[in-house]
Amino acid sequence: MIVPVRCFTCGKVLADKYYEFKKRVEAGEDPGKVLDDLGVERYCCRRTLLSHVELIDQVMVYKVY
């Protein structure tokens, strides 16, 4: 839902890389190459960025009581 600040497994900071990753992948670059360029080498960190889905805009529609 919200951009992952850290890797869920190892705790490495990923938030500073997320928007660059997203921008480059949407521009058509290969996700694996982008992760290599950003220095994300651990498979747990790669999984965290690759599998993240932004749902915050859809969730914000509902009221909170």
UniProtKB/Swiss-Prot annotation:
InterPro entries: RNA_pol_su_RPB10, RNA_pol_suN_Zn-BS, RPABC5/Rpb10. The keyword Cytoplasm applies. Its EC number is 2.7.7.6. GO terms for biological process: DNA-templated transcription. One of its GO terms (molecular function) is DNA binding. It is an enzyme of class 2 (transferase). Keywords: Chromosome, Cytoplasm, DNA-directed RNA polymerase, Metal-binding, Nucleotidyltransferase, Transcription, Transferase, Zinc. The keyword GTP-binding does not apply. Belongs to the archaeal Rpo10/eukaryotic RPB10 RNA polymerase subunit family. This is DNA-directed RNA polymerase subunit Rpo10. It comes from Thermococcus kodakarensis (strain ATCC BAA-918 / JCM 12380 / KOD1) (Pyrococcus kodakaraensis (strain KOD1)).
